[in-house]
């Protein structure tokens, strides 16, 4: 018993540690992915307006490397999470991710962090596309002919690709927030359903509020259950009597109730004796009938003996009557 009791907490603790590791891998991979995308965009967009010798190769190498490492970490964490979920479903254990962080599930926290990272990255990319780089001599392209140089049209020095990509990444971050909200609602509904299934017979003392249009109708709380379940769970002093009522005595035992009266059945026995007294009819006196009311069930033979006994003295004077 003790080994089984200690094995279950160890298994739950191991599952929680694995969940924390998966959460860390998800967050670390998402951060690497966002940083790699930012470095790659900034490096390649900045280097396309400069000669290759003046552009740093670190940005071109570090950006894609970080993005690939982050994507691989996210895929690894996702596969490990699926394996853990299948193992828990096979063993029938409870999900430790339901209250992972501040009472929220792990998926909800992951979606929040992903949304925040993508939202921040999209805003940074949009800022880079609008204000960086400025209009300088190094970034200005050479005019193709002399006629165009005379025209005083302002040059657009911002990156059009960054201006398009930034809002798209912000939109992806907002989608992650929506997914987090949906995850929270689904977790609340599932926990409510499980609580209703486990304690479906619990009595609620709160009034019921129903909204119809602009008005709110308040109904009183439902009445308590007619038959309490506690009486069935805990044996009460009257449980034996209830059991006796549910299982009536045998038919043959009904004839022996008058012979061995109990304190509980004395009233019923007296009533039954009175019924026997008033239903018996015969030539005997009332004292005899009252006396025979308490006799056993073999009463008819004794009545016959009493009837034959007074018949003999009646016949004797008839014989001696003639002189």
UniProtKB/Swiss-Prot annotation:
<feature type="region of interest" description="Disordered">
    <location>
        <begin position="251"/>
        <end position="323"/>
    </location>
</feature>
<dbReference type="Pfam" id="PF15471">
    <property type="entry name" value="TMEM171"/>
</dbReference>
<protein>
    <recommendedName>
        <fullName>Transmembrane protein 171</fullName>
    </recommendedName>
</protein>
<keyword id="KW-1133">Transmembrane helix</keyword>
<feature type="transmembrane region" description="Helical">
    <location>
        <begin position="22"/>
        <end position="42"/>
    </location>
</feature>
<dbReference type="InterPro" id="IPR029173">
    <property type="entry name" value="TMEM171"/>
</dbReference>
<feature type="compositionally biased region" description="Low complexity">
    <location>
        <begin position="281"/>
        <end position="290"/>
    </location>
</feature>
<feature type="transmembrane region" description="Helical">
    <location>
        <begin position="57"/>
        <end position="77"/>
    </location>
</feature>
<keyword id="KW-0472">Membrane</keyword>
<dbReference type="GO" id="GO:0016020">
    <property type="term" value="C:membrane"/>
</dbReference>
<keyword id="KW-0812">Transmembrane</keyword>
<feature type="compositionally biased region" description="Polar residues">
    <location>
        <begin position="251"/>
        <end position="268"/>
    </location>
</feature>
<feature type="transmembrane region" description="Helical">
    <location>
        <begin position="159"/>
        <end position="179"/>
    </location>
</feature>
<feature type="transmembrane region" description="Helical">
    <location>
        <begin position="112"/>
        <end position="132"/>
    </location>
</feature>
